[in-house]
Amino acid sequence: MTLYAKWEINVYTVSFATNGGSKVSEVDAEFASLIEEPTPPEKEGHSFKGWYQDELLTEAWDFEVETITENITLYAKWEINVYTVSFESNGGSQVSEVEAEYGSSITEPVPPEKEGHSFLGWYQDELLTEAWDFETSTVSEDMILYAKWEINEYTVSFELNGGSHVSEVEAEYGSTITEPAPPEKEGHSFLGWYQDELHTEAWDFETDVISENMTLYAQWSINNYDVHYDGNDYDSGEAPLTEAFAYDSEVTVAGQHTLGRNGYTFIGWNTERDGSGDQFEPGDTYRMGSEPLTLYAQWASNNAKLSELVISHGTLTPIFEADYAHYAVEVGHQVTSITITPTLQDTRSTVSISQNEAASGEVSSAIPLEEGLNTIIIDITAEDGSTYAYTVDVMRKVTDQFAQLTRESHFVTLDDEQIHMLDEEGTLRVDLQGELDDVTEVKFTQYQVQLLQEKGAFVQVVKEDLLVYIPFINFEPVKDLNITIQRQDYNIDTFAFADRSASAIYQLNIDQNGERISVFEHDIQLSFPVKNIGETNLEELQVYYFNPDGQEWELIGGTYNNGYIHATTSHFSTFAVFHPDHLSVEDDVTQDENGEEKSEEDNKEEIVEENTEEDNKEEKTIEAGEELPLTATRTYQFLLAGIIMLVGGSCIYVFYRRRNIMKT
C-alpha cells in the first residue's frame, strides 16, 4: 500500500519589530503563503519606510511576492522627519526659516532688530507665553517661533548751559514728553530746548517723539538792565543819564556830572540812599547784576567849623566866632593845665586837640601848660575830609621873667611880649650885666607902664654891683617912664668919703614924661653886693644916700645877707654902702632919710660918735693887731653898734611889712 503521507502545512508566526513605532500584532501564516501588509505603524517624528527582513534594514519585504517559509520577524524601517521652523519677527528684521530633524534642537539665529525695541527671545505661541529654549527644546513638527519685543525706554537729559537744574526723564520709544518747567539762569531769559548744541533745531514737545537716549540743550538770551543815577537830595545840576547794560558786562560808574548840594561835597555813589550799601567812586568798574540798579549820590558835609569853644580858665580873645581861627588866652602862673570843650556845628565831623582825639560837647582831658606861650591846635575834619584849624595861644604867665632888651646907644628898650607873660605881682628882670653894663637908662613905653602897673608887677634892674627892685604901682599908667642907673666914680671931691664906700656908688633917677619923680608911695629896694674892707664887720654896713645940699651922706639903713646889703628907700638919689665908722662924725650924718629930727637916743648916738672920734685919734697910735683896752670909749662903741643893729632890724621889718602890704 501505499501509504500516503499526510501533510499538514506549517503555520508560521510573523512578528513585527516596529523599532520604536506603534505596536503591530504578529500574524500567523502558512508556509509559502503571502501575508497582508499590516497597517503601518506610527512613530513620532518619523515616516514609516517599510518592513525589512533583517535588523540592518537592508532587505525589504515585499508583501506582494514574498511568502512565509518560517517564523520570521519583520523589522520596521523609519526615516526621521525634517521639519521647517519659521520665525515670525513681529515687526522686527527678517529671520530665515530653518530645517530641522525631529527631536533635534536648532541654533538660535541672530536676534532680529526692531527700532525702539529690545528683543526678548522666541516664543512657541503667538501670545508669547511659552518661550523656546534653544538649548533644550527640540523640533517635533513644522513650527513657527514668534519674536517677543519690549519697547525701549530712553533717558532724556537736559543741558542747562548754566541754568537751574532740570531732572532727566524716562520716555518710551516713540512717545512724546511733557515740557519741563522752564529753567532759570541769572541775568538771562530762557528761549527753549534744542536737539543740538549749536541750537539750530528746536525740540517740539507736541510732535517730536523719543527715539533714543538724548540730550536737549537750553538756549538763553542775555538780559539788559538799567543803571539809574539818583541825585539824593541834590539842590542843583543834573544827574548822569540812565544807561542799559548787559548782564555781567563791565559797567564804568559815571561821575558827578553837574550835580551839586550846598554845604556838601560829592563823594561818590552808593547802592543805598543812606550809604549803607556798596560804595562806588566815579570811574570804578563793576559787573552788571541781574536786576536794574539805582545808584544814589553820596554827599559828605564840608562843615569843619565849631559852634562853640569853651576854655576852662581865662577868656578867649576875641570872643569866639566860628569863622575866626586864632584866639589868645591869658592865665595865671598858678594854672598848670586847662581843658577845652569844643562843640561841632556838624556832629559828623571829628575834632582833635593837639592831635589827641576829642568829643563834641565834651570836656577834653587836661592839657598841661608850660610857662609862657602854649599853642593849642584844634583840628576839625569834616565828613568829606576837608579840614579847619583853630589856634588858641594860651599865655601862662610867669612870676619871674627876664625882659627882652634892645640896645640903642646908652639906653635899652623892652619887648612887650615878656611883660604880657608876667603874672600878677610878678617880677620883670632887666639884666644890665655883661655887654650891657655901661647902659645907664631903661625906657618903658606908656603901654608897658600901664601893663606893669595893672599887674601890680615889680621891675628888678640887675647890675653886676647893684639890684634895684621897683614896684610899678608907684607910677601913673598913662605916661612913659625912664629909669636912670648911673655908676659914679669914687671921687671924694664929688662925694665925701667916696673912697671908703664898701659898694659901687650909683645915682638913680626916675622920670615920667620928662618929669622927675622924687618920692615914692611904695618903697624901692636896693641891694648892693659889698666888699670886705679891712676888718670891717659886714653886718655893720649900712646904705646911705648923698645929700647934695649938705654934701653929706645920710643913713638909710640896711641888712646884710649873704654878700648883699639890702635896704629900702622912698626916693631916688645917689646911693652907696659905708661902715658907719668910715664916715666923719662931724655932722656927716645929721638926719635919717625921711628928714625927721633926731630923738634923744639919736643925740646919745652923736655923743657916742664924738667920743668915738676922740678915742679913734688915740687908737691910731696903737699898733695894728694889738687888742684895745676895754675903756669907756669902747663901751660907747658897743652901745653905738647895738643901736645901729636895732635900727637896721627895724628897717628890715618895715621893708618886709610894706612889701607884704603891696602884694596883698
UniProtKB/Swiss-Prot annotation:
Keyword ATP-binding part of the UniProt annotation: no
Membrane topology: Single-pass membrane protein
Keyword Hydrolase: no
Subcellular locations according to the entry: Cell membrane
Keyword annotations: Cell membrane, Membrane, Transmembrane, Transmembrane helix
Gene Ontology CC annotation, any one: plasma membrane
Location (main, coarse): membrane
Domain of life of the source: Bacteria
Sequence segments annotated as region (Disordered): 588-622
TM helices/strands, residue ranges: 636-656
Acidic residues bias: start-end ranges: 588-616
Pfam families named in the record: Cadherin-like, Flg_new
Protein name: Putative membrane protein Bcell_0381
Upper taxonomic lineage: Bacteria, Bacillati, Bacillota, Bacilli, Bacillales
